[in-house]
């Protein structure tokens, strides 16, 4: 054990194990998660060479092999609980992504949410066992987040009771679905449903694309890999072109909308019911943002405790770089953010399951807010985590640029989440639509509930945005509850400003659509403020549920740091709204620095509580034992370029040197 890390752990003010239990949900869940981790880490079938030193084709082959092993092992170990399946899947490929991932994260959830009982009986068991390997083909070359623009068609033929699928243009070719290129044999395809000469919009169809047994593409199917990407080397993101490809009528997912044998269309009870899969995945992505940022913080903070550099006082030993205030200022707000997102991710998961149960009983009342909240928080957390991971990499100096740090892999595998499952700016604008509807409800004298209930407090007589400067508040910068109130006022103010500016543009432009576009910057800012408020609120409320006094104290410091750092970065919003005064902002900036000092002695223990095993981090710099330099040298020796003393390419240089 590196002596610096031992000293850091010995000086912690709390027991990291107890905090791990809180993050997992209970001591029993921690025990079971570790049990599953050890099943994998101690199983020779799951061992493989360092993927960093393999070609893309080799990495893909390793990933497919391990995915097949994963399914067999889950059967062998009797793992069926959804949480346990998730833990197992995360660990079997460690820091990398899997070609069959969309089978479990999109294909099966969509089948569960939108399939009839008969459809689930037909496909569910086979897809869980990978006899059917599914993907989710929504995005096209020409359209992504704008779903109504998708061009793929599914035209019903009543004579044969089949749908005929076509990709009528080059831009209609399905593009990007993970596992589509070489792995999947089925896809849930989103296509424009046409029956009796009328288009009824997007619907989901289960489409066989490869022959089971030979894995060759079926007639009418052109399918392949889209080529190298920024990351995701282990996944065969693919393209799919369909030419008069026929599927049975029963392959349309018909839990809600239906097409009768004669071609009659039966519309769903509510169009919102088809949001199910998107809402599920977006709520899941909030937790993924927390996990990715937590990993990056673990690596950067441990390394900063091991790394000694420069001088604070001339002539004294080189200090740990974690002792520099600038390093603390880079990393500790991100650590606080990681904890905030952990708690928000758990809240979103619980909320999704609760509301989904209500939907199953016909209660759709909370679905609009859930849709808005998952869209906004997906964007807010992924943008923040994405920036934070890169900040952690740069905080590790030159070594952070090496793949041995693990940080480049974390970054390239996380950054797609800013654009997949809804491009983030568009997600923020979806949240803004809900905020504007809620504002209009309040303005018309109705009350709103849920996370937007703060809009009920808006005085109805206030018309001009500049008149917002009448908030009756005195913010206590040492009170999480008071800071939550400040964020609430900021959100209300920015929602109202966006609403008033939108109203002005509607009056001036006569077109709601043009007005919306010309107000979209204000609308995104309103959504960001709303999401920021939600995160602060949930973090603050979590403190009240913590029993252990030492853990509550350190989490309170993190909550204050998260909230105050956010104010310091958005001081203009709090000043313009007269939510806070200039002297208070000065106090905020000073308090942030005090909190850095307070958190310093617990920083390593706080990342230890995330409980990432070394193999999960995949980082030489973030090793639990802190023995960075010895292992850095050993890692470099394994580079394929070092297999021969003289590389074969020397022949190109030799002729130039023969003249010397």
From Swiss-Prot:
One of its GO terms (molecular function) is flavin adenine dinucleotide binding. The modification N6-acetyllysine is found at residues 216, 255, 267, 272, 437, 446, 500, 504, 512, 637, 651. Widely expressed with highest levels of isoform 1 and isoform 2 detected in testis. Isoform 1 is expressed at higher levels than isoform 2 in liver and kidney while isoform 2 levels are higher in brain, lung, muscle, white adipose tissue and testis. Levels are almost equal in heart. The modification Phosphoserine is found at residues 26, 649. Keywords: Acetylation, Deafness, Disease variant, FAD, Fatty acid metabolism, Flavoprotein, Lipid metabolism, Neuropathy, Oxidoreductase, Peroxisome, Phosphoprotein. FAD binds at residues 139, 178. Belongs to the acyl-CoA oxidase family. Involved in the initial and rate-limiting step of peroxisomal beta-oxidation of straight-chain saturated and unsaturated very-long-chain fatty acids. Catalyzes the desaturation of fatty acyl-CoAs such as palmitoyl-CoA (hexadecanoyl-CoA) to 2-trans-enoyl-CoAs ((2E)-enoyl-CoAs) such as (2E)-hexadecenoyl-CoA, and donates electrons directly to molecular oxygen (O(2)), thereby producing hydrogen peroxide (H(2)O(2)). This is Peroxisomal acyl-coenzyme A oxidase 1. The lineage of its organism: Eukaryota, Metazoa, Chordata, Craniata, Vertebrata. The gene is ACOX1.
